[in-house]
UniProtKB/Swiss-Prot annotation:
The keyword Methyltransferase applies. Keywords: Methyltransferase, S-adenosyl-L-methionine, Transferase, tRNA processing. It catalyses: guanosine(46) in tRNA + S-adenosyl-L-methionine = N(7)-methylguanosine(46) in tRNA + S-adenosyl-L-homocysteine. InterPro entries: SAM-dependent_MTases_sf (IPR029063), tRNA_(Gua-N-7)_MeTrfase_Trmb (IPR003358), tRNA_methyltr_TrmB_bact (IPR055361). HAMAP family: tRNA_methyltr_TrmB (MF_01057). Catalyzes the formation of N(7)-methylguanine at position 46 (m7G46) in tRNA. PROSITE patterns: SAM_MT_TRMB. GO terms for molecular function: tRNA (guanine(46)-N7)-methyltransferase activity. Its EC number is 2.1.1.33. S-adenosyl-L-methionine binds at E79, E104, D131, D154. This is tRNA (guanine-N(7)-)-methyltransferase. Belongs to the class I-like SAM-binding methyltransferase superfamily. TrmB family. One of its GO terms (cellular component) is tRNA methyltransferase complex.
Amino acid sequence: MSEKYTFADQKRKTVEQAEFTEDGRYLRKVRSFVLRTGRLSDFQRDMMNDHWAKFGLDYQKSPFDFVEIFGNANPVVLEIGFGMGRSLVEMAAQNPDRNYIGIEVHTPGVGACIAYAVEKQVDNLRVICHDATEILRDAVADGSLAGLQLYFPDPWQKSKHHKRRIVQTEFVMRLLTKLTAGGFIHFATDWQNYAEHMLAVLRQFSPALVNTSPTGDFIDRPAFRPLTKFEARGQRLGHAVWDLYFVKK
């Protein structure tokens, strides 16, 4: 096994995700999912091996220096769970005055995202393959983010699994500390129950977080959010989508 192969393959590991009680209190650490071997294609592996030095960020226990990473002081937007990364790359390409960091635990998605970033020749994007809760806790400085995007997270449909949902009181509390004044939180889901849960959690932080919806709940699908592969599939199945957009005072 070559050294380059080892680098990409070591990203395929078990990722732990924090588990919370229904009222948002930290409960314990659980193994939420496993990054399975055999799904990372040779092409995706090569993209990670060959371009990680430019696009990749590794987990660290101290805050990232975004100015050093990007070479400028442009606003930084963090996206959690970018899937295959196409919409994230498109957003970065359309907004060169913003810097984007994407977190994804599945290495095929990381490899695909890097490949598309290379194709689109974007310089304002970095990717991380690690548990998002640990990145937020350890590697993102307070007040350093201009925005947080979370599109179509796992809804954990069964009631007994709702505590595994990433959007919980403690999660949003941490997001609030990481955002700069005027920074945004943008969630999207195609599960109504999860949308209502997200809304209830976000409302707990009023007036520090302001809902931009004129109706006080959800916003229309914004044109600036590219259509994801996941969303397009949902549309074909007749699924509705709920967007929430809150801004920190």
